[in-house]
């Protein structure tokens, strides 16, 4: 299981962006991230075509299956979910369709119950909710 954002475990820095200007102000080691909204598909395409490492954050409590697969066509490093039920469903899709993107659940890393749920459902990884401000 990947663990991102833990103070004792080194990980890349996530930078929330809204447009390509945000990409230009990031460093090569940063992972840019943005909301999984259909209006951001162009941003995902830009990242894919220009070799920019990016992640997509699914904020909704209801995953839009078409949006999930459309964003995955542009090969994000991570698909980050704030809702555990959506993370579990996305993980099933990622496993069944052999997607390259890793599924992460954004959580309080001190919540032992959520760790158990993630492990039981074989979620690829977790990320501290504090890493995504």
Where is each model-derived feature located?
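C-terminal helical cap(s) of enzyme catalytic domains, especially alpha/beta-barrels
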Residues: 131-133
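Residue-level detector of alpha-helical secondary structure
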Residues: 45-48, 91
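Catalytic cores of alpha/beta
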Residues: 112-121
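Structured loop/turn residues at beta-strand edges in well-structured enzyme cores
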Residues: 27, 74, 121
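Catalytic beta/alpha-barrel core
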Residues: 4-6, 15-22, 30-39, 52-63, ...
């Amino acid at each position: 299981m990947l663990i991102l954002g833990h103070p004792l475990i080194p990980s890349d820095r996530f930078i929330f962006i809204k447009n390509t200007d945000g990409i230009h102000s990031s460093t090569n080691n940063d992972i840019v991230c943005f909301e999984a909204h259909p209006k951001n598909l162009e941003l995902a395409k830009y990242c894919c075509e220009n070799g920019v490492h990016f992640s997509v954050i699914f904020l909704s409590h209801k995953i839009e299956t078409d949006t999930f697969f459309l964003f995955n066509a542009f090969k994000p490093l991570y698909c980050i979910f704030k809702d555990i039920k959506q993370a579990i469903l996305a993980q099933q899709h990622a496993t069944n369709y052999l997607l390259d993107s890793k599924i992460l659940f954004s959580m309080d890393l001190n919540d032992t119950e959520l760790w158990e749920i993630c492990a039981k459902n074989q979620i690829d990884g977790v990320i501290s909710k504090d890493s995504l401000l």
